[in-house]
Amino acid sequence: MKTFTPKPADLTHDWYVIDATDVVLGRLATQAAVLLRGKNKPTYAPHADSGNHVIIINADKIALTGNKMGKELYSHSGRPGGLRRDSYAELLEKNPERIIKNAVKGMLPKNRLAKVQLDRLRVFRGAEHPHTPQKPQVFEIAQVSQQAK
């Protein structure tokens, strides 16, 4: 059996918008990663760039379960003394986009295509986004956090 390779005409990049209000971080990240890779399409091929554009709004209202508020997110600049440690509680106030981008990045494959797919992810703190001319489809995540209820 031959490997299926989608034609360039089949490689359309649709736009989706996801509301992150009271959605658990891991559930949001897995759904976003599936959409970014294009696994929701019948023409999916792991080696082809068939992913979609994903817009996540209300990033500051995301739900973190367990003890993640005390957990830290590390990054290093590569320079001496360049280690940066931020707790999730600090990041939720200052930069909630970084929490979501890092979670989605961890769920994408570790290859060259992952950078292209991650560039199609756009995360916004509030409910407004500048991508209304693209007419994104609303993508509902069924399960919201039990803590929010």
From Swiss-Prot:
The gene is rplM. This is Large ribosomal subunit protein uL13. InterPro entries: Ribosomal_uL13, Ribosomal_uL13_bac-type, Ribosomal_uL13_sf. GO terms for cellular component: cytosolic large ribosomal subunit. This protein is one of the early assembly proteins of the 50S ribosomal subunit, although it is not seen to bind rRNA by itself. It is important during the early stages of 50S assembly. Gene3D superfamilies: Ribosomal protein L13. It comes from Bifidobacterium longum subsp. infantis (strain ATCC 15697 / DSM 20088 / JCM 1222 / NCTC 11817 / S12). Part of the 50S ribosomal subunit. Keywords: Ribonucleoprotein, Ribosomal protein.
